Regions:
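Conserved nucleotide- and phosphate/pyrophosphate-binding catalytic cores
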Residues: 1-187
Length: 187
């Protein structure tokens, strides 16, 4: 913001989140008040992108819930963080409003819901995990991606620096101009 203000420019746009708030913070499968984290000791607190279908299903079935049936409305979810967490995950992965999920599953027990949630996660996550494993087993492809990415980043950075030099009022130095100055002023 300081650069924008000091040089009266909008060169560095403010970033906008790509993930909606409700989906940006997924809670632990073991504790609905804690964020899901790969640093958690228990592998059953999270779904990893490389988990196989059986493991995803097992983790969801063991996810912490209370003994009460699934709530029928949002207000009933207020004091049930584990239920809210699983319902939000299902809602996000299936692109449904939470109210629609509650209309479908409200009053039912969690076992049926967990089966549906597990199936949805398997359908969404397993293709990603398969691709990750393919990429990790193809070192030549990964090396090419790294080299291509480095070249693209360098091109973008060079272009950005040129624009920043213009905005700030600095003269752009090239190696040729540096060598010319050296040759002119060498002692």
């Amino acid at each position: 913001m300081g650069f924008q203000r000091d040089f009266n420019t909008k060169f560095f746009p403010l970033t906008e989140p790509l993930i909606p708030d409700a989906e940006s913070r997924i809670m632990s499968l073991r504790d609905g008040k804690k964020k899901m984290s790969k640093s958690d000791e228990s592998d059953f607190s999270r779904i990893n992108l490389t988990d196989d279908p059986d493991l995803i299903s097992q983790k969801i079935k063991k996810a912490k819930t209370d003994s009460a049936p699934i709530p029928k409305n949002l207000k009933e979810l207020d004091k049930r963080p584990e239920a809210l967490n699983l319902i939000q995950i299902y809602s996000s992965i299936n692109k449904l409003e939470i109210e629609k999920v509650l209309n479908e599953f409200g009053g039912k027990n969690f076992s049926e819901f967990k089966n549906k949630l597990g199936d949805s996660l398997i359908e969404s996550i397993c293709p990603i995990g398969k691709k990750i494993k393919e990429y990790l087993n193809d070192s030549q492809y990964l090396e090419k991606v790294l080299i291509d990415g480095s070249q693209k980043a360098s091109e973008i950075a060079t272009k950005n620096l040129e624009e920043i030099y213009d905005i700030v009022g600095l003269k752009k130095f090239t190696w040729n101009s540096v060598f010319n100055l050296y040759n002119i002023y060498k002692c």
